Amino acid sequence: MKGIRSNIPRALNAGAQIACVDNTGAKVVEIISVKKYRGVKNRMPCAGIGDMCVVSVKKGTPEMRKQILLAVVVRQKQEFRRPDGLHVSFEDNAMVITDEDGIPKGTDIKGPVAREVAERFPKIGTTASIIV
C-alpha cells in the first residue's frame, strides 16, 4: 500500500452509513473502524479517501447482509486539495468492498474513483471505469 501525496481530510466518522458502489451485492455499509488509524485516546476513528475500513453490510442481498468486511473509501463529499492546487469534491460518499490486500471483490465499480485511490490500490484503479 502506497502513501497518498495529498493531505486528505478525514470526513467519514465511525458509524457513518455509506453507499457501496460495486457489484458484490452490498448496497449500504456502516463504518465500524478504520485500519491503521492512530488517534488520541477515546477519539472516534474517522476515514478519508483511500482509507481501508472495517464495515458491516446494512442493506443488500441476504447473503451479504450482517457480514463484517473490509472496504476502501473511493469518493467523499468533503473537498480536498491536491498538490497542484486543484480542489476536488464528489457528489456522494462511496466505498468498494475489498480483501486484505486491497483487491476488490466485485468486478465492476459504478461512478468515478479518486486518483489517490487508484495510486494506492492499483487493482481498484484497473477495475474503475472513470478515474478523476
UniProtKB/Swiss-Prot annotation:
The keyword Ribosomal protein applies. Keywords: Ribonucleoprotein, Ribosomal protein, RNA-binding, rRNA-binding. PROSITE patterns: RIBOSOMAL_L14. One of its GO terms (cellular component) is cytosolic large ribosomal subunit. GO terms for molecular function: large ribosomal subunit rRNA binding; structural constituent of ribosome. CDD domains: Ribosomal_uL14. One of its GO terms (biological process) is translation. This is Large ribosomal subunit protein uL14. It comes from Methanosarcina mazei (strain ATCC BAA-159 / DSM 3647 / Goe1 / Go1 / JCM 11833 / OCM 88). The gene is rpl14.
